Amino acid sequence: MDEPILRDAIEADLPAIVAIYNSAIPGRMATADLEPVMVEIRRSWFDEHNSGSRPLWVLARGAEIVAWLSFQSFYGRPAYQATAEISVYVAPEHHRHGYARRLVGESLKRAPALGLKTLLAFIFGHNDPSIALFRGFGFDTWANLPAVAALDGVERDLLILGKRVA
């Protein structure tokens, strides 16, 4: 099986990106959305990305998108321009193939060229695999927001993991 290639997402990838995101919702581990989102709703989110400073990357094997990573501005104020939140999602049938690790590793390598000095990851406190992934790259817990999310009546903590990259 060919190794997927990393590239900037194009608009034609958006349905696959949304499908991967929606596949994470029922597990209540990776997103605070409780219902599937529509492609049309995510179009403005897609348009906020740009390859020069806030890319949206996909890992593609031919026409199949197996995983994606997003850089998003933190807090939307100019003083935070050198800080970005990264989010990574992998299609369920491609979990445990190292794709999230590959994407996070690339984000760390390329962040300085994007003008970034700090990367953040917002992760539920019960999402042990994601916490381990980011800690494996040297991210530290910078904040714990206790019981801020209610997922099916269960209150969950939100951790903010951070790493200086430049």
Language-model regions, residue ranges each:
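Conserved beta-strand-loop-alpha-helix junction that forms the acyl-donor binding cleft
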Residues: 121-131
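Glycine-rich acetyl-CoA-binding "A-motif" of GNAT/NAT acetyltransferases
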Residues: 64-68, 129, 155
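Conserved GNAT acetyl-CoA-binding A-motif
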Residues: 111-123
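Conserved acetyl-CoA-binding loop-helix of GNAT-fold acetyltransferases
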Residues: 96-109, 132-136
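Conserved catalytic-core motifs of GNAT/GCN5-like acyltransferases
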Residues: 70-73, 78, 120-123, 140-157
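Conserved GNAT-fold acetyl-CoA-binding loop/helix
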Residues: 18-45
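A short beta-loop-alpha structural element at the N-terminal edge
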Residues: 5-17
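Acetyl-CoA-dependent GNAT
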Residues: 8, 35-93, 104-105, 164-165
